[in-house]
């Protein structure tokens, strides 16, 4: 129905807004790291690791040492992956990890 199609479109639009927000916050954090000459770390866990019951406060612990914490999806758009890969790259999550890792290796403070 039209209502379902409209709802699906709205959901996809919102998902894109969320991705954009995450990327912009990642870029903002990277600028902060550079401006304040501090370190950052990219936590590249599974998406469910954002749950405090699973990550046991690790991001907050790292941050308490004045180390900025970023997620892989906040920096993956900044990296490129040389292809072909020597691994099977069939999942989007792993593709983002490869991009994030390739970006991180170019940064002295990450």
What do the PLM-derived regions correspond to, one by one?
Residues 1-110:
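An N-terminal assembly and electron-transfer interface module characteristic of large anaerobic redox
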